[in-house]
Amino acid sequence: MAAMDDRLRERQERRVAFLRELYDTVDSSVTTFTGGFDVGERVGADRTEALRIIEYWAEKEMIKVDDYSSGMVRLTAAGVDAVETG
């Protein structure tokens, strides 16, 4: 059970780190698209996990996805607010 808890915590931490890294990458812009797979790689996620993270944040309306196959994403105003308010 502890190993599962650790895995869940790490997954949650990477999701939060992804949103923060995206925020830093685009300097809090809500109009600048960037490569979500690259952002995922910088926070330790492989392509499969990065796609799951992208899907998660898109579902929560924290990011907009231009193209899932290329992983092009941008922050939404809600995403900026989430990062800035912690």
Predicted regions located by residue number:
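Short alpha-helical segments that sit at the start of domains
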Residues: 1-22, 28
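Short acidic, hydrophobic short linear motifs in intrinsically disordered regions
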Residues: 28-42
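Short amphipathic alpha-helical interaction segments
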Residues: 44-59
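A short, conserved structural fragment
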Residues: 58-68
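Minor-groove-contacting beta-hairpin "wing" of winged helix-turn-helix DNA-binding domains
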Residues: 70-75
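Short, amphipathic alpha-helical interaction segments positioned at domain boundaries
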Residues: 77-86
